[in-house]
C-alpha cells in the first residue's frame, strides 16, 4: 500500500480548504441503532464542512449510511467509494448482480473509471483486489477514522496505525468509539503498552472520539506523536513514496 504522508490542510479532491477523510466501517448496521445514527450524523457533518468521504464503496450497513448522509439530500456532497469487483454483489445491493455497470467494470484495469453508479453514493471506482482498494483509499485521504465494524475494519485501521508507527505517513488516526464499542480494544492496547510491546508515545498515534464533532476536532487538532520510528523508505522504490508526501 502507498500513502501520502502529509496530514495537514491539503485536500485530495475535496473542496479548497476541506479534507478528504477515509472512514472504515461495517457493511452491516450492527446491533444498536446508535451506530447507524452516528454514521448519519458524521456524514452530515462532513457535508456541512465540505469535507470529502473516502470509503469502501458499499451501499449496505454503516458504509451506505455514511455515504448517503455525506452526499446530502441535495446530492451536493463529495463521496468516493473504492470497491473490489468480487465484493460488488455483496456490498452493492442497489445494482444488478449480472450487469453491474460496464463503464465501471472497465475501470478494473485502468483505475480511471470513477463513474457514479448511483448519485446518492457519489463516485465509485471498482478495482481488481483488496490491496488496490486500500492503497487508493489511503492515497486519497488526509485522515483515517474507524467506526464500528468487523475483521475488515480492524485490519484496515491497524495497518494505518502500523504505518504511522513506521514513519510512512503522518495522518491523523481516529477511533470513533460509539457507545464504548472500542473500549475492550483500547484496554488491550493499554495492556500491550504496560507489557512493553508498544511504547507510551506510540500509543498516542491513536486518538479516540465519542461524537461526530469530536472526530472532526481530533482530526483538525492532531499532533504527530514523538517516538515513532525514523526510518528511510526511499530504497523501497515507489512502494511508499506516495505515502511519504
Curated annotation (Swiss-Prot):
Single GO molecular function: cytokinin riboside 5'-monophosphate phosphoribohydrolase activity
GO annotation terms (biological process): cytokinin biosynthetic process; response to purine-containing compound
Gene3D superfamilies associated with the record: 3.40.50.450
Coiled-coil blocks: none
GO cellular component, one term: cytosol
InterPro entries xref list: LOG, LOG_fam
Pfam families: Lysine_decarbox
UniProt family annotation: Belongs to the LOG family.
Note: Present with 6440 molecules/cell in log phase SD medium.
Protein name (Swiss-Prot/TrEMBL): LOG family protein YJL055W
UniProt source species: Saccharomyces cerevisiae (strain ATCC 204508 / S288c) (Baker's yeast)
Amino acid at each position: 500500500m502507498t500513502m501520502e504522508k502529509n496530514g495537514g490542510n491539503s485536500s485530495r479532491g475535496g473542496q479548497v480548504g476541506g479534507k478528504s477523510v477515509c472512514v472504515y466501517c461495517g457493511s452491516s448496521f450492527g446491533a444498536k441503532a446508535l451506530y447507524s445514527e452516528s454514521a448519519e450524523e458524521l456524514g452530515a457533518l462532513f457535508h456541512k464542512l465540505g469535507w470529502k468521504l473516502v470509503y469502501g464503496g458499499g451501499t449496505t450497513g454503516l458504509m451506505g449510511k455514511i455515504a448517503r448522509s455525506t452526499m446530502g439530500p441535495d446530492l451536493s456532497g463529495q463521496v468516493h467509494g473504492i470497491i473490489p469487483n468480487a465484493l460488488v454483489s455483496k456490498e452493492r445491493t442497489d445494482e444488478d448482480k449480472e450487469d453491474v455497470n460496464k463503464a465501471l467494470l472497465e475501470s478494473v484495469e485502468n483505475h480511471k473509471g470513477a463513474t457514479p453508479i448511483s448519485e446518492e453514493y457519489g463516485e465509485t471506482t471498482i478495482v481488481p483486489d483488496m490491496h488496490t482498494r486500500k492503497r487508493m483509499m489511503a492515497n486519497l485521504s488526509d485522515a483515517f477514522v474507524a467506526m464500528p465494524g468487523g475483521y475488515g475494519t480492524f485490519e484496515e485501521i491497524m495497518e494505518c496505525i502500523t504505518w504511522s508507527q513506521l514513519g510512512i505517513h503522518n495522518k491523523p488516526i481516529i477511533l470513533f468509539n460509539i457507545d464504548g464499542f472500542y473500549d475492550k480494544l483500547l484496554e488491550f492496547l493499554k495492556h500491550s503498552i504496560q507489557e512493553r510491546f508498544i511504547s507510551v508515545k506510540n500509543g498516542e498515534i491513536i486518538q479516540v472520539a465519542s461524537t461526530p464533532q469530536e472526530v472532526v476536532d481530533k482530526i483538525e487538532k492532531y499532533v504527530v506523536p514523538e517516538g515513532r520510528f525514523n526510518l528511510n523508505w526511499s530504497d523501497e522504490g515507489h512502494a511508499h513514496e506516495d505515502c511519504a508526501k
